[in-house]
Every structure is written in structure tokens, then in C-alpha cells.
Amino acid sequence: MKYMIASDIHGSSYYCQKLMDAYQQEKPDRLILLGDILYHGPRNDLPKDYAPKKVIEMLNSISDSMLCVRGNCDCEVDQMVLDFPCLADYSVLDINGLFIYCTHGHLKPVKLKPGSLLLCGHTHVPALENRDGIIYMNPGSVSIPKENSPHSYMILEDCVFTWKDLETLSQYRYKEFPKSK
């Protein structure tokens, strides 16, 4: 299966449309959203073309392919308008033997086993780090990137994670994991 992984749309219809365009081009089986979907939050400036209703319409059009976790800017009202579950604090995936813990990143995760992958957003900065044997990965932010990082998302296919620039769809980082036997 092919997965598209994104985080921190924050209600930007402009960048959500770019994500939808990339979704159409990439043709993933699933879109994993790591939270902060509709609201920009009190610490962020309004993103370009802040229009949560348009974001709702775009994401609901692909609701059958969505897997989503709650971000610190998401709430019960969001669930009333979205056609896919969006309020779980985390999701655990086993993909080709990779144990992947998906969360937004604003809450401390449960204790993970060495070799596990922690996939989260929240910081708006793409990341790939080994933290005490746990691989931490962040796709960056769709709409409000920080620290001069690009508007970005990730692709997971055949145990290879690829970070992509949302503006150019070009790859700028990748990490391959061995497939389980």
C-alpha cells in the first residue's frame, strides 16, 4: 500500500488544495493526517486563504481514504463537520513489519519499544531523528512551515519514507527501512 502523510493544514484552503492536487498525482491508498486540520490556533497567524469550510469540503470528498489523529487545535466541533474520525489521540499501524505510532506530537507518547517509529506533526518542521532507539519522523506542515522549511508532506511506500515539497512535488529527503521477512 501507498500512504500519504500530512499535518497542520490549519484551515488553509490554498494549501489544502495543493495537498489534494498532490494526492491526485501520488494516488495513495490512504491519507494519514496528523492533526490540526481546520483551526489556525491562537499562536499562529492566519494561513494563506484561511477557509475551513472549503477544507472540510475537500477532505470530506476523500473521507474513505482518511486516517486521522487529533491535533492540539482540533475539537469536538470539527468531528461534527468532518466525515471521518479525527479525535483519536493516536493510531498504531503495523505496515510491512514496521510498528508506527501516529500522533500529533503535542502530548507525550506512550512508552515505545526501541525500533518503533514515532510519526507526528505539531512542530511544523520536517524531522528524521533517532531518539534512544526510537525513530522520530515529522512530515512538516502543509500550510504554516517553520524554520525555513518547505510546505511539505511524506509518502510511505514499500518501507521507504519520502519527504516532498508541496510546491514543487520534488523529493528532498528519504529514509528506507528493511522489510520484515
Describe these PLM feature segments.
Residues 2-95:
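Core catalytic region of metal-dependent phosphoesterases/phosphodiesterases
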Residues 84-87, 96-165, 170-172, 177:
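Conserved beta-sheet core of the metallophosphoesterase superfamily
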Residues 179-181:
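Non-catalytic terminal accessory segments
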